[in-house]
Structure formats: structure tokens, C-alpha cells
Amino acid sequence: MKRLLLGLMILVSAARAAPEPASIVGEWWTPGFNARVRIEPCGEAVCGRIVWLWDEVPKGIVDKNPLIGRVVIDGMKSTQAGRWAGGRLYNPEDGRDYKGSLALRSPEQLVVDGCVLFICQTQVWRRADAARCPPVAMPPQ
């Protein structure tokens, strides 16, 4: 009986010690540190907005609307630990929305896939380090 109780206590403590999957909520740098995107919960999904740009109006951008505050990740729902799908990704370079998915490669790297039919493009975003990158205030909407 004592062995059974000891075994159960070990199992319960091991289950509690298991790390929770990392969250994508927070701020992320796009490749080349050209933009910073804040990912936050929105209902049962997550959404992401541009909170900082290297250039206010980057060259080659089709969309002439302001990009700061623009939603670029919309409606991504968790499909399994470390993966989100079912939402849309907005590409300011061509002004189009794409079917997308997100996956945590590590707590510091987010793989962002955008697809049209069977043609996909992948980017790896880096988590913005809060110690070196203070929070960016969003403009009023």
C-alpha cells in the first residue's frame, strides 16, 4: 500500500512538473527586423498587429493605408501544442490575404507559413526581447 501511494505521489508530481507549451502571445520581429508584430488573443483565436516599422512607408508596398496598427495575423486557432491554423495572413507588400499557419520552432522562433493553392512562403520570426526592446505604444484607433 505504501509503495502504491509513493508511486502515485511521484506520478502526480511529475505531471505537475511538465512544462506548459510556450505561448506565441507577445511581440515578434519579422525577418531583417523590418517590422515588429504584437500577437494577442482575440476571442478563441490569436491575432497580430504591426506595432513598429523600420521605414514608415517601406519601398515596394502596394497598400498605401497606414501599416502601424494593421492586422497581419487574423483568426489563427490552436490546432495542437505549438501550432495555430485556420486564419489569414496579410502581406503588405502585395496587399493580399493568404491562408496561413503558425508553429513554434522554439520559445524564441515562430515559423509563419502563408499559402495560395499549393504555393507557400515561409518566414521565421524572432521573439522580441523585452529587456532590450521596451513595449511599443499602439496609436489610438
Language-model features: where?
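Sec-dependent signal peptide recognition
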Residues: 1-7
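Central antiparallel beta-sheet cores of small beta-barrel/beta-sandwich binding domains
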Residues: 24-25, 31-99
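N-terminal helix-cap/turn-to-beta initiation motif at the start of protein domains
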Residues: 18-26
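Edge beta-strand at a domain terminus
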Residues: 116-141
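Residue-level recognition of beta-strand termini and adjacent short loop/turns
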Residues: 106-108
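Short aromatic-glycine motifs in intrinsically disordered, low-complexity regions
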Residues: 61, 110-117
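Short polar/acidic secondary-structure junctions
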Residues: 92, 103, 115-117
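Hydrophobic h-region of N-terminal signal peptides that target proteins for export
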Residues: 8-17
